[in-house]
Amino acid sequence: LTCVTSKSIFGITTENCPDGQNLCFKKWYYIVPRYSDITWGCAATCPKPTNVRETIHCCETDKCNE
């Protein structure tokens, strides 16, 4: 499985997930209007939001967390 790990104006960076990590995730942490801190990566299980400002999307196909 290949997941996106970062995005910039120059394109995306990906990584091949290690064995046992069969999900890609994208996590948004709302900071202020029009600005969120976004994290991408691989996971064995879908992470759970830690507070109401956090949204997490998990998926199972290559680069699906773009």
From Swiss-Prot:
This is Muscarinic toxin 4. Keywords: Disulfide bond, G-protein coupled acetylcholine receptor impairing toxin, G-protein coupled receptor impairing toxin, Neurotoxin, Postsynaptic neurotoxin, Secreted, Toxin. InterPro entries: Snake_3FTx, Snake_toxin-like_sf, Snake_toxin_con_site, Toxin_cobra-type. The keyword Transmembrane does not apply. Belongs to the three-finger toxin family. Short-chain subfamily. Aminergic toxin sub-subfamily. One of its GO terms (cellular component) is extracellular region. The keyword Disulfide bond applies. Pfam families: Toxin_cobra-type (PF21947). Monomer. GO terms for molecular function: toxin activity. Binds to the muscarinic acetylcholine receptor (CHRM). Disulfide bonds join C3-C24, C17-C42, C46-C58, C59-C64. SUPFAM superfamilies: Snake toxin-like. The lineage of its organism: Eukaryota, Metazoa, Chordata, Craniata, Vertebrata. CDD domains: TFP_snake_toxin. It is found in: Secreted. Expressed by the venom gland. It comes from the Eukaryota.
